């Protein structure tokens, strides 16, 4: 069980709180309009609670990264956030300058400020922060960003679960100077994911698809070796890799595996099949893309697949839906096919419907599958839609997440004080 400090552990009255969130949103590159404000809505409970407890809240966040078209200011984020929490959020177009510092010093209880995109500062995007030997509060605390801001605050609340697999200064550096506390979103994410990883109600089924097959296979390896998953249902590129490992000739689909740099995953799939063949389920049929039309085709080891596989087939949908229906816990990540094309959305939509209608506890990962759930109007029927993409996958793969590790360290240091 992961232990960390929460908002219940401190008195925030008249205290300055630096709140790190992940409100990285899809943005129209031409207009700058925020296309989906889900991540902004998800942090409402933490901000509202801090306001109600009399805190002075200063928010740090990022949008995209240098070189991307959606790498922009947080001005529009402040407007949307103001609407979401029903209170004006003051936007300041700098992070550590005199204007920002003066505004922070002069805050009143209940005030909320959103500072500029922290990734405008080179310290925040150094590749070194991905290396474990550099991930220490002291090292991050030595950055200019943290040294300038930390003296202004009493507490550091981290609600940026979607960035928990990162180790930038703004995510972990403040913990060298003050308690690092989990926000309500962070608390909920870690609680739910810990439950489905460490103590799921059985039978537990993992449904893994999408194009990020290496990430999904890391998750599969962890949940099978730990006895977490009773069945793993594969689809997308993940399924293709396992089909190749089983001796199927997927023709042009093998080219895609190679082009994505995933050929090495075939050997890993073979090893997993040797150990857990009875728990790994692969498609029995697929939907081929022939001149942009959906053509159902059974899989046969004696026949080469001559066209692109864009979805699982109807027999597989029925098979997977039956297994999902019997499950007490379902964890899904990645779409079953190219759901953006209407002809090949069936697998993803039907599996999501099966998950939503199941009586089991359901969790789906962020990214493409959560977007699909929104598209098909199913998201509100899922017990937990994670805000994390890479962070969720790393967590389920049993890897250390820098933000979570620092929350644990802060608990040891400050609990009971």
Swiss-Prot record:
<feature type="binding site">
    <location>
        <begin position="22"/>
        <end position="24"/>
    </location>
    <ligand>
        <name>substrate</name>
    </ligand>
</feature>
<keyword id="KW-0067">ATP-binding</keyword>
<feature type="binding site">
    <location>
        <position position="39"/>
    </location>
    <ligand>
        <name>substrate</name>
    </ligand>
</feature>
<dbReference type="Pfam" id="PF00162">
    <property type="entry name" value="PGK"/>
</dbReference>
<comment type="pathway">
    <text>Carbohydrate degradation; glycolysis; pyruvate from D-glyceraldehyde 3-phosphate: step 2/5.</text>
</comment>
<keyword id="KW-0963">Cytoplasm</keyword>
<dbReference type="InterPro" id="IPR036043">
    <property type="entry name" value="Phosphoglycerate_kinase_sf"/>
</dbReference>
<dbReference type="InterPro" id="IPR015911">
    <property type="entry name" value="Phosphoglycerate_kinase_CS"/>
</dbReference>
<dbReference type="GO" id="GO:0006094">
    <property type="term" value="P:gluconeogenesis"/>
</dbReference>
<keyword id="KW-0418">Kinase</keyword>
<dbReference type="InterPro" id="IPR015824">
    <property type="entry name" value="Phosphoglycerate_kinase_N"/>
</dbReference>
<keyword id="KW-0808">Transferase</keyword>
<dbReference type="GO" id="GO:0005524">
    <property type="term" value="F:ATP binding"/>
</dbReference>
<dbReference type="GO" id="GO:0004618">
    <property type="term" value="F:phosphoglycerate kinase activity"/>
</dbReference>
<keyword id="KW-0324">Glycolysis</keyword>
<dbReference type="GO" id="GO:0006096">
    <property type="term" value="P:glycolytic process"/>
</dbReference>
<feature type="binding site">
    <location>
        <begin position="366"/>
        <end position="369"/>
    </location>
    <ligand>
        <name>ATP</name>
    </ligand>
</feature>
<feature type="binding site">
    <location>
        <begin position="62"/>
        <end position="65"/>
    </location>
    <ligand>
        <name>substrate</name>
    </ligand>
</feature>
<dbReference type="GO" id="GO:0043531">
    <property type="term" value="F:ADP binding"/>
</dbReference>
<feature type="binding site">
    <location>
        <position position="340"/>
    </location>
    <ligand>
        <name>ATP</name>
    </ligand>
</feature>
<keyword id="KW-0547">Nucleotide-binding</keyword>
<protein>
    <recommendedName>
        <fullName>Phosphoglycerate kinase</fullName>
        <ecNumber>2.7.2.3</ecNumber>
    </recommendedName>
</protein>
<dbReference type="InterPro" id="IPR001576">
    <property type="entry name" value="Phosphoglycerate_kinase"/>
</dbReference>
<dbReference type="GO" id="GO:0005829">
    <property type="term" value="C:cytosol"/>
</dbReference>
<comment type="subunit">
    <text>Homodimer.</text>
</comment>
<comment type="similarity">
    <text>Belongs to the phosphoglycerate kinase family.</text>
</comment>
<feature type="binding site">
    <location>
        <position position="119"/>
    </location>
    <ligand>
        <name>substrate</name>
    </ligand>
</feature>
<feature type="binding site">
    <location>
        <position position="166"/>
    </location>
    <ligand>
        <name>substrate</name>
    </ligand>
</feature>
